[in-house]
Amino acid sequence: MKEYQVYLERSRSRQQDFLYPLLFREYIYGLAYSHHFHRSIFLENVGYDNKYSLLIVKRLITRMYQQNHLIISANDSPKNPFWGYNKNLDCQIISEGFAIVVEIPFFRQLSSSFEEAEILKSFKNLRSIHSIFPFLEDKFTYLNYVSDIRIPYPIHLEILVQILRYWVKDAPFFHLLRLFLYHFCNWNSFISTKKWISTFSKSNPRLFLFLHNFYVCEYEYILVFLRNKSSHLGFKSFSIFFERIFFYGKREHLGKVFAKDFSYPLTFFKDPNIHYVRYQGKCILASKNAPFLMNKWKHYFIHLWQCFFDVWSQPRMININPLSEHSFQLLGYFSNVRLNRSVVRSQMLQNTFLIEIVIKKLDIIVPIIPLIRSLAKAKFCNVLGEPISKPVWADSSDFDIIDRFLRICRNLSHYYNGSSKKKSLYRIKYILRLSCIKTLACKHKSTVRAFLKRSGSEELLQEFFTEEEEIISLIFPRDSSTLQRLHRNRIWYLDILFSNDLVHDE
């Protein structure tokens, strides 16, 4: 067991000593925004662009040292003169530069791991959210049991800092990290309280996503490490889906995980039919084996979280159900395996046999109730799904109002085009279309019927229903049977890097 501990320490021995020498050199910020580092793999297109001057960041850091208020305690007042006149803006600007510098070595390490795993060529395709669903269609129809797992929270901030200590040996790095965390939340609180996440993720999205990614990657790293060091079988398939905070992976032959000091014996079992998929804070674990082995996996995950991360995970957070009787929610879809039964009559000489054939098919359905709840929250309809006007947008021009509704409709249609049943998607498009008409009628202080009759906008609003057909017809002829089949079948897009906010309404 000491051998495992040595291996783990050796694999983590490439610690980074990078922070303070870089923060004072403006050219590192230029490097961060250069061809290689101008986009974070953790968060793309955050929308900051040129809002933050690199010279301002350097001056703010210099002012921090001149004021000499780097030492803080848990009892300090939020109105610390250290932050100057606009402490929120100062902290936000510095944290942006801080996050960029921190991401550089981890980005290089991730790129090297991709090259070693020979999956760098497929990295671009794996960035699409829809790349998960072909994998589910290919594998889950052969499995029997599924387990919904929610990655436990909360995790204490001090535990998060201690996890980073495995990889970074620069003490000033942790002083500055604690400074940012203390500024945005109570140090004695937890990382995943809703109020703190809402505040921190909006003001510091880059730093927040980096910390969240690191926490999740660490627990998955331990599982992969233990499996690699204790099994003679190599991975047949392993890949990472990296888009903002979303990951995708398939892991086989994972093992039993004990306390972080590895003082207990490590025992592993081989399970070539286990499949693991994670999206945000939720995991899906599926297997072909009996519930007994799935319960073992449940124990392994709980033991890892409690012993290594000191996070209490309730057993009810992990549910094990037959895949044919349970629908699991992932990426805004409801998915389950449907059994299609058919009877075939077979005759041999004078004997006739009836043979029942069962074919498994993965059903991926649009969750109509959560979507209507999201639309009602966004004031497009009421809780019953009846469209209402959007008075907030009434000050915009007619073209802008229609364009806003069309963009939302396009995004949802694009995202949910892989659904097995399109009726729910058509209902959502109808709600948005009628809400758009009511908004225009409200702006012109008219009824819906009178507005459509006077302005002739009905033809323009047909784009809500015809755009998808026009796009597909560019590839296939209109009279083609393939075109008709595509309207009924699923279409997965490999260019979707993020989902609409309406998809993730809680």
From Swiss-Prot:
GO cellular component: chloroplast
Keyword RNA-binding among record annotations: yes
Keyword Cell membrane: no
Annotated keywords: Chloroplast, mRNA processing, Plastid, RNA-binding, tRNA processing
Highest taxon above the source species: Eukaryota
GO MF annotations, alphabetized: RNA binding
Main location: plastid
Compartment annotation: Plastid, Chloroplast
Biological process per Gene Ontology, one example term: mRNA processing
HAMAP family listed in its UniProt record: MatK (MF_01390)
Role of this protein: Usually encoded in the trnK tRNA gene intron. Probably assists in splicing its own and other chloroplast group II introns.
Family affiliation: Belongs to the intron maturase 2 family. MatK subfamily.
Protein name: Maturase K
Species of origin: Pisum sativum
